[in-house]
């Protein structure tokens, strides 16, 4: 009997991986960076809904296959957009032919120009300066990074991309208008946001993924949010750019949130560690901004998800309708909370609620809970607010904090069940 159950479990996991591969091939290009489970629309009662095992039961072989799928999807994305996207030295997608230099001196930029590099832009976000340089034709990202480093750059990286959990074509329906706390969403654009700004070509423009995330905060139509009446500050880092969701766009979006005194910002995007983004997030946190981020849906064998893994970021995983950790949930270097991330509805582009699944949709619930007790940025008061949230969390899994649920599950009643 046990052998039969193990065999059936292995077959189910294999079916799940096949479903993931098929969905990755069908999803929009920029949602394939790090392949995710379906968001809008989901697949009804298919194999993805039948898998509900705890992440701790995910076998090593399956986890490795999931990581292989992620890498294959990244390579496919580069093949589809070779002029816009390339792999960085660590194998992560990034803007092709561009490097980012932190705190560049005039002398360094002049030396780079003499070697054929072109200054695209020079900016400062929260007191942190950086420049984007276009490399001479024929230089790989690895070669460009090495060359600029030899000129004396303290920190030079590729402009790495960050992935959404998925989206579908269509014009997005507006979230409910509100007069409550301002909650930030860094994602695709949000229809009906109280504040909106664009940080990519063609932005801001309404996006299904961003609108779905926002609907889980403020509510929209029959979808109840975690904080009804909240106002949404939307920073669109994707627009119409295949290479949207890059680190510099997210950094600028965070700076915009600070300027608008947003106390809680949710980022349902995942990517690799990036030193510029790490510094900007730390600067925002020092100004009292709580950053909430999803751990991603790439399985436990994937590299740690960022920005969830940066120090002080509130890392969020998802649970299904029966309170079980999502089998596909990624990992961060730490985990704070879990929240509903499956067997539920969010607002989609058609103006109707649709099934969603993934840690992207758990993060906004946690952001809503924090914003309820922390409506304005106050560095001295953030710790007390998080302590209040801790008291609301339901302990799950092993007693006390654990790798599957963090310090507990939040906002369980916030889910709009999928019938």
Located regions from the model:
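Autoinhibitory propeptides
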Residues: 2, 36, 41-50, 54-55, ...
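C-terminal subdomain of the subtilisin-like protease fold in secreted/lumenal serine endopeptidases
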Residues: 19, 34-37, 41-44, 84-89, ...
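N-terminal signal peptide c-region/cleavage motif recognized by signal peptidases
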Residues: 24-29
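Substrate-binding/access-modulating region of protease and related hydrolase catalytic domains
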Residues: 33-36, 238-310, 324-325, 350-363, ...
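Loop/turn elements at helix/coil->beta-strand transitions in domains of secreted/extracellular proteins
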Residues: 153-155, 179-182, 228-232, 260-265, ...
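Subtilisin-like serine protease catalytic core
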Residues: 173-182, 189-248, 310-311, 330-334, ...
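Extracellular S/T/G-rich loop segment that most often corresponds to the catalytic His/Ser-adjacent loop
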Residues: 181, 185-187, 305-375, 379, ...
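Gly/Ser-rich catalytic serine loop of serine hydrolases
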Residues: 202-214, 298, 354-366
């Amino acid at each position: 009997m046990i052998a039969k159950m193990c065999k059936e479990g292995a077959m189910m996991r294999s079916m799940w991986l096949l479903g993931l591969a098929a969905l990755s091939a069908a999803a929009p290009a920029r949602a394939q960076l790090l392949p995710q489970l379906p968001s809008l629309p989901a697949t009804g009662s298919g194999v993805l809904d039948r898998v509900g095992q705890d992440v701790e039961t995910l076998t090593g072989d399956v986890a490795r296959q999931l990581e292989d799928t992620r890498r294959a999807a990244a390579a496919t994305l580069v093949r589809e957009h070779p002029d816009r996207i390339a792999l960085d030295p660590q194998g992560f997608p990034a803007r092709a032919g561009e490097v980012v230099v932190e705190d560049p001196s005039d002398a360094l930029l002049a030396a780079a120009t003499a070697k054929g590099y072109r200054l695209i832009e020079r900016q400062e976000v929260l007191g942190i300066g950086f420049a984007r340089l276009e490399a001479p034709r024929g230089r790989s990202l690895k070669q460009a990074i090495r060359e600029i480093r030899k000129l004396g750059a303290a920190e030079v990286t590729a402009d790495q991309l960050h992935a959404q959990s998925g989206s579908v074509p269509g014009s997005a329906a507006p979230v409910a208008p509100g007069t409550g706390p301002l909650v930030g969403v860094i994602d695709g654009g949000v229809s009906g946001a109280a504040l909106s700004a664009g940080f990519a070509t063609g932005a801001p423009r309404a996006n299904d993924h961003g609108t779905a995330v926002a609907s889980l905060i403020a509510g929209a139509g029959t979808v109840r949010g975690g904080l009804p009446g909240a106002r949404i500050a939307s920073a669109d880092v994707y627009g119409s750019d295949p290479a949207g969701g890059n680190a510099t766009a997210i950094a600028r979006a965070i700076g915009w949130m600070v300027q608008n005194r947003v106390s809680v910002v949710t980022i349902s995007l995942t990517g690799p560690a990036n030193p510029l983004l790490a510094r900007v997030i730390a600067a925002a946190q020092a100004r009292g901004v709580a950053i909430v981020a999803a751990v991603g849906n790439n399985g436990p064998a994937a590299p740690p998800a960022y920005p969830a893994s940066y120090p002080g970021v509130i890392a969020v995983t998802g649970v299904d309708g029966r309170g079980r950790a999502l089998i596909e949930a990624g990992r961060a270097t730490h985990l704070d909370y879990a929240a509903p991330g499956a067997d539920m509805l969010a607002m989609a582009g058609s103006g109707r609620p649709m099934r969603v699944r993934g840690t992207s949709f758990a993060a906004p619930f946690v952001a809503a809970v924090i914003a309820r007790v922390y409506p304005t940025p106050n560095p001295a008061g953030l710790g007390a607010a998080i302590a209040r949230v801790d008291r609301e969390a339901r302990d799950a899994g092993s007693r006390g904090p654990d790798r599957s649920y963090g310090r507990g599950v939040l906002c369980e009643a916030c889910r709009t069940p999928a019938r």
